[in-house]
Structures are given as structure tokens and as C-alpha cells.
């Protein structure tokens, strides 16, 4: 259950606080990452892929749906996975700003488990999760360009 919420938007709060305390110069990069990821994900879900159903709407035999207590099963706005985009955006952000090598495998496992959990709790298809990873990658690259161009003087 915890991993299913690994990419919840609230994860940005401790990321913001830690960046503010220890890596203040990267705050614009973090904010750009949050904004880019949110805009790309939500515009995709609400405008471009609005009719994309989730597994619960597609699989007619409810016995095949794995249910987890505490997880509300949604039926629409599946593509891309916003939780996965958030988890991978945070992971990639940490990779960019940290010199510590252990961040890469630990962060990758965190993000990957978050994406896998979205499939496990029947909230997304694997393609939705893959698209969430792509959103994160594009968001982090765009945010880095913005950061370098406007804030890294």
C-alpha cells in the first residue's frame, strides 16, 4: 500500500524542505521539475488522453482485479501514470543534485517500486507507467535547461 503512494504529490514537500535547507541553489530546478511534470501529466490526462480507461474499467471480471485495502479504484484518466511521473521525477532530480553514488540505485528502486505498485493495485497498465517514466525524463531535461539558462549564473 505504501509503495502505491510513493509518487503521491505530497512527496514534493519533504523534497522542497530538504532542497531549501541543503541545496538552495537548486530550488528553481526543483520547482521547474514539479511544474513541468504536473503540466505534462495533467494536460495528457485531461486533454489528450481523457478517455483512457484504467484496468478496472477494461477488465470485466472483477475477480481478476487485485484489490488492496485503502486504495480507491478509479476507472478513467489512466494515461500517463502521474504517480510514476512524480516518483521518477524526484529520483532523477536527486541524481542531478547529489554527488552521492548510492542515490542512483536506491532512488531507482524507490521509483521503480512506485511504478510497479501502480500496476499491482490495478490503477494503471504497464504502458501508463512507461509513459509516466517518459514524462519524468522529459520534465527533468526541460527543467534542467530552464535552470541552466535562467538561474545558473
Indicate residue ranges for each PLM-predicted region.
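Interfacial segments of alpha-helical transmembrane regions
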Residues: 15-43
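N-terminal transmembrane-helix/juxtamembrane module of multi-pass inner/ER membrane proteins
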Residues: 1-12, 42-74
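Short, Lys/Arg-enriched, Gly/Pro-containing loop segments at transmembrane-helix junctions
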Residues: 31, 54-55, 149-153
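Membrane-embedded catalytic cores of phosphoryl/pyrophosphoryl-handling enzymes
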Residues: 21, 62-153
